[in-house]
Every structure is written in structure tokens, then in C-alpha cells.
């Protein structure tokens, strides 16, 4: 019982391993749980248990992901590891496993490979804010100069995608040696150094409740004698009776005052992130607000029609399209609580997009929707999901 209590006093941070196939992501994940369990308690998860990752669904897409946890002196980490490259792409784009930071695993023997580059680019596109590097298999490289060279290459690659390459912590070690209990510099001590790098380089994540208030509108009712009530799940922040909010998206932005906050038919002084609430709006008519808009703290979010996005297109086996799509493709984009039709513009030199591909696209919606960078969405045709995406840049 006491242990449960103790756990919750540590700050919770979400991380994950990224990097090229066979560079040792899963071995490192196992090593982190082993060293963490030995030093701070918790459960050791063996390689095989992590590798047999269960399938889960996120936004209609099946992804294999292994979830493990471990502790350091000051934090409790929830860590995701994916068995296949396609699972990484899907995981990062759907935000199924939101990461406060990532551990880039790169083999010292091979140096950066195509997926190393692709995962760094994806991390940049989908808004993974911090990266720490583990240079794995350091026992396979005798030449110190070669290690320096690989480290330099990794730093250059990070800088190329706007991560602070020169200031990123790079820990050299061998995940396998650490798993075997090796106490030399590249064994267990390397894992301890990596854990310390996570603690110091990844800042404390901002909690949803500390961000400005935002609630997507799910339903609108008119209550006679009281006015218009808007219901939804508060995404972030806190709302109090008397607060001014903006109604953003679909039509021109307007302002109103919240005159009541209800949960489970009880009146409250305030609602906060995670609450399913009904907000009573002063002087707002039933037809002036609709599903798909958001209520937000004034000035914190704007509506946009055009944006760039990183998208993953479902394969036929996943229940997606059976045929490719071309420039000018117009599906529906499901953002927060509504479908909005939009037109897809492919990058120069890309003729078509096949089911199973991931690609950067530009989208023009028919109506403006409240969004910012990092906003997740599903791509749908006739009510079925055919893809998933994340806004990487707002244009207009």
C-alpha cells in the first residue's frame, strides 16, 4: 500500500525509443527496466516480453506497441517501444503514445541509417520536443575516432531537423552488456547515465490543466429560461463562472461569457481538463454555436483552412483504401469533434500516394477549423477511416 503512495509522488513522464531496425531499441528498453528495477524498484521486462507487443487501436488504426515503466531518482517513466518501422510511423502520427521526449538509439557500428533519419524527421513533424541519444553496441567498435565520427554524424542529423544537435546528450554503451549485468563503463553504468540524461534533458511536461482553457463542442442544447448550454470534454485548462470565452471555428470568431458550469446535472464553480461538462453561455443563441467549434480562452487558438500535415494512409489490410489517391483528393478530415471536407495537395514530384504510405501533404478545408501545430486528425471517406495525420504547420 505504502509503495503505491510513494509511486505517485514522482513526476510522470512519457518517453519512447526511436531509431533504425536492429539498432537495439528493444534491448535498450529491456535494459532500462532491469537497471531501474534493481535501483528503484519496479518490474524487469525481458526482451521477449517487450518484442511480443500487443496490438491496439488508435483512431481506427491497429498498432503494435509495448508499454513498459521504470523509475529514476526523481521520475516515473512510461516508455513505449514498437516492434516494426510501420508501427513507429503510425504511433507517432496518430499520437497513440504521446511522447514528452524520445530516446534515439543508433548503432555505433553502423552509424545513422535511413530509418534513423526518418524517425528524427517524424519526431520534428509530429512535435516530439526533446531527443536524447544512446549510441548502442559501443563494444563492437574498437576505434575511438570512429565513435567520434558516428557521434558527429548523429549530431549533424539532429541539427538538420532543427533539434539542438550540439547540445543533445549522447550516451555510449551496450544495452546487451547492461542486460547481462556487465559493470564496465559501457554496461550498467551507461544505462544509469542515460537515465540521468533523461532526467536532466527532458523538462517537466506541462500538464493539460496548466494550459489555456479549450473545450471542443460536442452538443448544443437550449434550456428554456436559462439559455444555451454547450457540452463537451474539457481538453485543457480551467473554466470558471464569469470567464469570457471565444467560440472558434467554422464561422467568424465570437465572444461570450460562461454563466454556469454543470457536471452530472450539478452546478459547479469551475470545470477543468478531463471533465465532461455543460457550459451555459450568456446571450448566445442555439443556432450560433455548433458541434465542431471550440470554446477557448480568448486569443489562444485561431481557426485555419490551410495547413501542412504528415499523414499515414491505411493499407488495404488495415481496412483502408484499395487504390492510390492523387493530387486533388477530397476526403473528410475529422478534427476533434467533426468532419470537414478538404482538398489534398501532394508534394512536388509525388504522383500518387499508395495505401500503407506516409507522406507530407498540404490540405485546404472548405471551412476554417480551430487548430494549431500538433493537432491530430483522422482522414475519412464515407464514415470509414482511411488515414491519420498531424498538423505540422499552419498556413492560413
Swiss-Prot record:
Gene3D superfamilies: P-loop containing nucleotide triphosphate hydrolases, Translation factors
PROSITE patterns reported for this sequence: G_TR_1 (PS00301), G_TR_2 (PS51722)
Subcellular location: Cytoplasm
Keyword match Protein biosynthesis: yes
Region called G4, residue ranges: 136-139
Keywords tagged on the record: Cytoplasm, Elongation factor, GTP-binding, Hydrolase, Magnesium, Metal-binding, Nucleotide-binding, Protein biosynthesis
CDD domains: EF_Tu, EFTU_II, EFTU_III
Annotated region described as G5, given as residue ranges: 174-176
UniProt EC number: 3.6.5.3
PANTHER family named among the record's database cross-references: ELONGATION FACTOR TU, MITOCHONDRIAL, ELONGATION FACTOR TU-RELATED
Subunit description: Monomer.
Name recorded for this polypeptide: Elongation factor Tu
Natural source organism: Xylella fastidiosa (strain Temecula1 / ATCC 700964)
